[in-house]
Amino acid sequence: MVGGSVPSPAVPAQAAPVPARAGKGTVVLAIGLPGSGKSSWFKRHDIHPLSSDLLRELLFDDAEEQRFQDLVFSNLRSMLKARLIARRPMNYVDATNLTPHDRHSWIKLAKDYGYDVQGLFFDVPVEICMERHQRRGRLVPEDIMRKMAGKLKAPTFAEGFSKITVVRVKQKEEGAVSPSE
């Protein structure tokens, strides 16, 4: 090379498009009642989310253990933080995230690390959620489910979401339900 200049490599013809919004990646928060289909949706899409149920299973050998919520969620946030520090481009959180207050710490953490935040809202009637829960052998008492349904608030862009996807169920002929997107 004369003069120390380095020729720039040719740009490949099929270079990936640059995202319109510069950032490190995305955090997707699932939002919905127990039994609304959050975990099933992730399984169907072959996605392995950070899951409060899975963490309870790992820590306490019981996905239904509810006595140590602060411990579960502080560990779950630490796991997400580790993924953000490692610059993992896609991050999914599988938890109920019922209220703006519940979602705030996730959104703040993601934004602090320069990540985009999207909501995946499972808008499913409480009766269907309770029926599904009974079928899978996990029983959240009806009064607790109804209390949770009363707390559930749909996500809004004002919370900091850049995109909100709503997942609903559609009725089949025999009254059975299946998820729809």
Q: Where are the language model's segments positioned?
A:
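Long, low-complexity intrinsically disordered regions
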Residues: M1-A16
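Conserved GTP-binding G-domain of TRAFAC-class P-loop NTPases and closely related GTPase folds
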Residues: P12-Q14, P19-A20, K24-I31, S36, ...
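A short glycine-/small-residue-rich loop at the edge of a beta-strand within enzyme catalytic domains
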Residues: R21-K24, V28, A63, R67, ...
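Short, glycine/acidic-enriched loop or turn micro-motifs at the edges of active sites
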Residues: G35, L54-R56, N97
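Conserved substrate/cofactor phosphate-moiety recognition/catalytic segment
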Residues: S39-P89, I128-M130
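ATP-dependent NMP and nucleoside kinases share a basic, alpha-helical "lid"
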Residues: L58, L98-R138, K147-T156
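Glycine-rich phosphate-binding loop used to anchor ATP phosphates in small-molecule kinases
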Residues: R67-F121
